[in-house]
């Protein structure tokens, strides 16, 4: 009788030479990592007290260097020197008590009452051009 063909996974399990090479490669990588660990990660084994010992020593203050006058920062100019804030005018009397409505003082509404007649603009431009009425509507 004929045997069933081996699957890929079964064939890989039977490849002992390939498995041995993979095992050697893994062992070599592990030994290299073990040798390189102190160089890359050795600072993690340093005791905490030794690490903070350097921080406890206060650094010596740097000598202050006098800058020439042209490099010094000028003092801040107060805002009141270049911005003048005058008191607000009194709130005008209005019919509704709000700013923006028509004033209750009769003389202040003149500019609002100039165009009290409502005019229709429909056809005004056409009349200036002397168009016939059929073209307006």
Curated annotation (Swiss-Prot):
Cellular localisation: Cell projection, Cilium
Range of residues in the leader sequence: none
Any Pfam family hit: LLC1
Tissue: Expressed in airway epithelial cells, renal tubular cells, pancreatic acinar cells and epithelial cells of the stomach, duodenum, and gallbladder (at protein level).
GO CC field: cilium
The organism's place on the tree of life at top rank: Eukaryota
Keywords for this protein: Cell projection
Keyword flag Transferase: no
Protein name: Ciliary microtubule inner protein 1
Organism the protein comes from: Homo sapiens (Human)
